[in-house]
Amino acid sequence: MLLIFWCISPIVLIPLLIFSSEKNSKNSKKVYVSEECLTWTKDGAKCGTIFHRDYEFYPNDHCGVLIPKVELNLKWVRQQIQPILYNQVIAKDAQGMLYEEQMANIEVDIPVDDNGEIDLAIQNKIYSEYYKLIQIKKNLENILEKYSI
């Protein structure tokens, strides 16, 4: 139950396992991403923030891209990996940084079935329950704000 990444640097492919991270520097040609993916903010004030994208976009040099090599519920992966990413950010008090080198070393447990295959159904169920909790939290925050409690 391990999540490892494919990290593609401008020079070499570092073999890891489930995701690819494409580096798009200012000197390289633009990469158009049309697959469902996760992205993370590589530097700056929001460094380590991860986003689920299911639309086409051009990542810039401040955006790391994780494209799945196997079928995963990326919303579930996002929910699992976000707390880990914040802990990996370098120089949090200054200009935070989280580059491909740090991402390549991050490990996340992935549920597997009795045959050792990635269990997409349990990812979907976990994320569904997580999403319900997020909605309850938002509703409570709205009530508290409405009544200034």
Features from the language model and the residues they span:
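DNA target-recognition domains and sequence-specific DNA-contacting regions of bacterial/archaeal
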Residues: 1-110
